Design a protein with these regions (language model features):
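A short SAM/SAH-binding and catalytic strip from SAM-dependent methyltransferases
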Residues: 134-147, 153, 162, 167
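A short hydrophobic/small-residue beta-strand
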Residues: 90, 161-162
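Short alpha-helix immediately C-terminal to the canonical SAM-binding loop
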Residues: 99-101, 169, 173
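Helix-to-beta-strand junctions that scaffold the AdoMet/dcAdoMet cofactor pocket
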Residues: 155-157
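SAM/dcSAM-binding transferase cores
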Residues: 174-227
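Conserved SAM/SAH cofactor-binding pocket of Class I
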Residues: 54-140, 148-149
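Class I SAM-dependent transferase core
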Residues: 2, 11-69, 98-118
């Protein structure tokens, strides 16, 4: 089965409509007892979770072959839809143990053998699995500069960070450029999409050099004392 969407004037087709919809059903059901998303209706979920996640498909396919991590994954967006569509080995990362337990249930129910989870801080993952990832995604998680610092130690050389954003101020972009030079990351792609009246932006940063400072820094410093 295929699911189609109209976003950029082109019709695109996805092969796994049943799995994508079943994931959303599971999210809405789980959300009745545990707050894993602010989106509670089917219609909003299809647009703001499923279709929004799939906007990142081209960016993920442009990354090198290898493991993919979705950091701050929450209900599994964009990680689960992108794992379903690409078949990449995927790690869903969240610091909230309860959310990760729910994600484990989703993965089992959906039969996703290419997907696993990590409950913990991104900095800890960076220490444990440095340079292990070809691609990382982050959706509405933090400022670009913080995401660059957190993702750089996880990425192998040539690997990419894919940032899902709504509005991005020029100041944030400029600061990210400065921090990128410190952590070995460079902007290589910047796409804007219209999705059901919402403006969405997907920025891809590539790891092009070793960081000039020791990363990851102590847990929490990226947010408390940003570069």
């Amino acid at each position: 089965k295929y699911v189609s969407r109209e976003t950029t004037g082109q019709k695109e087709w996805f092969m796994h409509e049943d799995l994508l919809k079943r994931h959303l059903e599971l999210v809405i059901e789980a959300n009745k007892t545990t707050n894993i998303t602010r989106i509670s209706s089917w219609e909003d979920g299809m647009v703001l979770h499923v279709q929004d996640s799939l906007l990142g498909l081209d960016a993920l396919n442009a990354c090198p072959e290898g493991r993919y991590a979705d950091i701050g994954t929450g209900a599994g967006y964009p990680g689960i839809p992108l794992a379903i569509e690409t078949g990449r080995p995927t790690l869903l990362v969240d610091s909230v143990q309860k959310k990760v337990q729910i994600l484990d249930g989703f993965i089992e129910e959906l039969g996703l053998e290419n997907v696993s989870t990590y409950a913990g801080r991104i900095e800890d993952l960076g220490r444990e699995q440095a340079g292990q990832f070809a691609a990382i995604s982050a959706r509405a998680l933090s400022k670009l500069s913080i995401l660059l610092e957190l993702s750089s130690p996880l990425l192998k050389m040539g690997g990419r960070l894919i940032c899902f954003k709504a509005l991005v101020e020029q100041d944030e972009l400029n600061h990210a450029r400065v921090v990128g030079k410190q952590v070995g990351m460079e902007l290589v792609d910047d796409q804007t999409y219209e999705l059901d009246g919402y403006s969405r932006r997907i920025l891809s940063y590539e790891k092009v050099a070793k960081p000039k400072l020791k990363l990851p820094r102590r847990t929490g410093l990226a947010q408390k004392k940003p570069l």
